[in-house]
C-alpha cells in the first residue's frame, strides 16, 4: 500500500541542488574529471583541537545520556562569550541564546514559531532556497525583496508598498550574502531596524558567513546595530566558520521573546543535541581563533586567484566582498541554466545556475571557492577554451 503525502509536503519547493548533484554524478560516472564549484560544502577539515575535544567528550559516559532540552549552559555561555569577544554584544545565555540543530533548522522552523497561516514573510531574491521551505511549512505568504547590482544587492525598503508593510510579520536577511557575496553596511542595518520597528516586523538575520570577509573588512553582526535586539535575532552556524557542516550545530541569539518561541518549538520537536557535540562546539567558540583567520586568508587568496583567472579569459566579473561565493554574470545570449549546463557538458565545470536562487538570480551563476587555487585556475582555463568571452584588458583591481 502506498500512502499519500500531506498537502504541505506536496507544496514544498523542488530541491534545486538535487538536480545539480544528479547532473554532476552522471558526468563523474562517465569518467570525467569534474571541477565542482556548484555547492557550498567547505573542503577543509574541522580544526584538530575541536576534533580532539569531541573525542574526549564522546569518551565520557555522562554525555551519552539525554542532554538538557534547551541546550547545555556551557554551549550557550560560550555563544554569549563569542559574541561579546567578536562583536561587543552582551547576551544573556539563558534568555537570549537558543541552541540549534544547524542554521538551516533554525531558519526553516522560525516561521512556524512566529506566524499563523496566511501571514506574510519578506524574503530576499536571490536568496537561500530553504527560506522558501520555511514559508511553505508555516502556510505563510512570501513577498520577494529584489537584490540587484545597482543597489549593491541590498533590498530597497522604500519600494515595499504600504499594504505589504502592513501585512509583513517576518523578514529574512543574509549578509555576507549567499549567493551574491555582498556585505551589509552599518547604514543599511540602521535602516533595517527603523523599517522593522515602524512596521512591527521581526528580522531574522542569517549570519552563516559571518567569519568570511575580505580586504580587511570584518562582516558586521546585525545585533551590533542599536535597537536590533528589540526587533530581531541572528542565526549563527559553526558549519562555515569551523568547517563543521556535517556536525549540525548552530545557535540563535537576540530578542528574548523569539528565543523563547524557538525553545518552545524545539521542546516539542527534539531532545537537544548530543552533549559531546555541544562540548566540542563550545571549545570551537572559546578557543584560540587562529584557525578562523587562516581560513579566511585562504578564501581571500582563492577569491583573488579565481577573479584574476576569470578576467584573463575576458569574463567581466566583480570580486565578492564576503562569503565563499562569487556571483558572476552569464554571457549574452544564455540563460543561467543554459550557461551552467554548457559549462558542465563542455568544460566539466559545475556551477550553480542563478535562477535556482530566485527570479532575480536569472542572468548569473554562483561559484563556490571551495577547492584549491590550482583547480580554480584550471576551471577558468577550461571555460576560456569555450571562447564565450571577448578577450580584452580588464582592470585587475580586486
Swiss-Prot record:
Which Pfam families is this protein grouped with? Aminotran_1_2
Alphabetical GO biological process terms: L-methionine salvage from methylthioadenosine
Write down the EC number: 2.6.1.117
Query: What GO MF terms are annotated?
Result: pyridoxal phosphate binding; transaminase activity
Q: Which residues carry this modification: N6-(pyridoxal phosphate)lysine?
A: 240
Disruption of the gene: reported phenotype: Disruption mutant grows more slowly than the wild type strain on methylthioribose (MTR) as the sulfur source.
Q: Which InterPro entries match?
A: Aminotransferase_I/II_large, LL-DAP_aminotransferase, PyrdxlP-dep_Trfase, PyrdxlP-dep_Trfase_major, PyrdxlP-dep_Trfase_small
Q: What is the top-level taxon of the source organism?
A: Bacteria
Q: CDD domains attached here?
A: AAT_like (cd00609)
Name what cofactor the protein needs.
Answer: pyridoxal 5'-phosphate
Q: Which reaction does it catalyse?
A: 4-methylsulfanyl-2-oxobutanoate + L-glutamine = 2-oxoglutaramate + L-methionine
Which pathway is this protein assigned to? Amino-acid biosynthesis; L-methionine biosynthesis via salvage pathway; L-methionine from S-methyl-5-thio-alpha-D-ribose 1-phosphate: step 6/6
Alphabetically ordered keywords of this record: Amino-acid biosynthesis, Aminotransferase, Methionine biosynthesis, Pyridoxal phosphate, Transferase
Q: Which Gene3D superfamilies match?
A: Aspartate Aminotransferase, domain 1, Type I PLP-dependent aspartate aminotransferase-like (Major domain)
Describe the function of this protein: Involved in the methylthioribose (MTR) recycling pathway. Catalyzes the formation of methionine from 2-keto-4-methylthiobutyrate (KMTB).
Task: Please state which protein family the record places this protein in.
Answer: Belongs to the class-I pyridoxal-phosphate-dependent aminotransferase family. MtnE subfamily.
Recorded protein name is L-glutamine--4-(methylsulfanyl)-2-oxobutanoate aminotransferase
Query: What is this organism's lineage?
Result: Bacteria, Bacillati, Bacillota, Bacilli, Bacillales
Gene for this chain: mtnE
Amino acid at each position: 500500500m502506498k500512502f499519500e503525502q500531506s498537502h504541505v509536503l506536496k507544496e514544498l519547493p523542488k530541491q534545486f541542488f538535487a538536480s545539480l548533484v544528479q547532473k554532476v554524478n552522471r558526468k563523474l560516472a562517465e569518467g570525467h574529471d569534474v571541477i565542482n564549484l556548484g555547492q557550498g560544502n567547505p573542503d577543509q577539515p574541522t580544526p584538530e583541537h575541536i576534533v580532539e575535544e569531541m573525542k574526549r567528550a564522546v569518551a565520557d559516559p555522562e554525555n551519552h545520556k539525554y542532554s538538557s532540552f534547551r541546550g547545555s549552559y556551557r554551549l550557550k555561555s560560550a555563544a554569549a562569550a563569542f559574541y561579546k569577544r567578536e562583536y561587543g554584544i552582551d547576551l544573556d545565555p539563558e534568555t537570549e541564546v537558543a541552541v540549534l540543530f544547524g542554521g538551516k533548522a533554525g531558519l526553516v522552523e522560525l516561521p512556524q514559531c512566529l506566524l499563523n497561516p496566511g501571514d506574510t514573510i519578506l524574503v530576499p531574491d536571490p536568496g537561500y532556497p530553504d527560506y522558501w521551505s520555511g514559508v511553505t511549512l508555516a502556510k505563510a505568504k512570501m513577498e520577494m525583496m529584489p537584490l540587484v547590482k545597482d543597489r549593491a544587492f541590498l533590498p530597497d525598503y522604500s519600494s515595499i508598498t504600504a499594504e505589504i508593510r502592513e501585512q509583513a510579520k517576518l523578514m529574512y536577511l543574509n549578509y555576507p550574502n549567499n549567493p551574491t557575496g555582498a556585505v551589509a553596511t552599518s547604514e543599511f542595518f540602521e535602516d533595517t531596524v527603523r523599517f522593522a520597528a515602524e512596521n512591527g516586523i521581526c528580522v531574522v538575520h542569517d549570519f552563516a558567513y559571518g567569519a568570511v570577509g575580505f580586504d580587511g573588512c570584518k562582516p558586521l553582526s546585525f545585533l551590533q546595530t542599536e535597537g536590533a535586539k528589540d526587533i530581531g535575532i541572528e542565526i549563527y552556524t559553526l558549519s562555515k566558520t569551523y568547517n563543521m557542516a556535517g556536525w549540525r550545530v548552530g545557535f540563535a541569539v537576540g530578542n528574548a521573546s523569539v528565543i523563547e518561541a524557538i525553545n518552545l518549538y524545539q521542546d516539542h520537536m527534539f531532545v537537544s543535541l548530543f552533549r559531546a557535540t555541544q562540548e566540542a562546539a563550545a571549545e570551537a567558540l572559546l578557543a584560540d581563533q587562529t584557525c578562523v583567520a587562516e581560513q579566511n586568508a585562504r578564501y581571500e587568496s582563492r577569491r583573488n586567484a579565481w577573479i584574476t583567472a576569470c578576467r584573463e579569459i575576458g569574463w567581466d566579473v566583480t570580486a565578492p566582498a564576503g562569503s565563499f561565493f562569487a556571483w558572476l554574470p552569464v554571457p549574452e545570449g544564455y540563460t543561467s541554466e543554459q550557461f551552467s549546463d554548457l559549462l558542465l557538458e563542455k568544460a566539466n565545470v559545475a556551477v550553480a545556475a542563478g535562477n535556482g536562487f530566485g527570479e532575480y538570480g536569472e542572468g548569473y551563476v554562483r561559484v563556490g571557492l571551495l577547492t584549491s587555487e590550482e583547480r580554480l585556475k584550471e576551471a577558468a582555463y577550461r571555460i576560456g577554451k569555450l571562447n564565450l568571452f571577448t578577450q580584452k584588458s580588464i582592470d585587475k583591481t580586486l
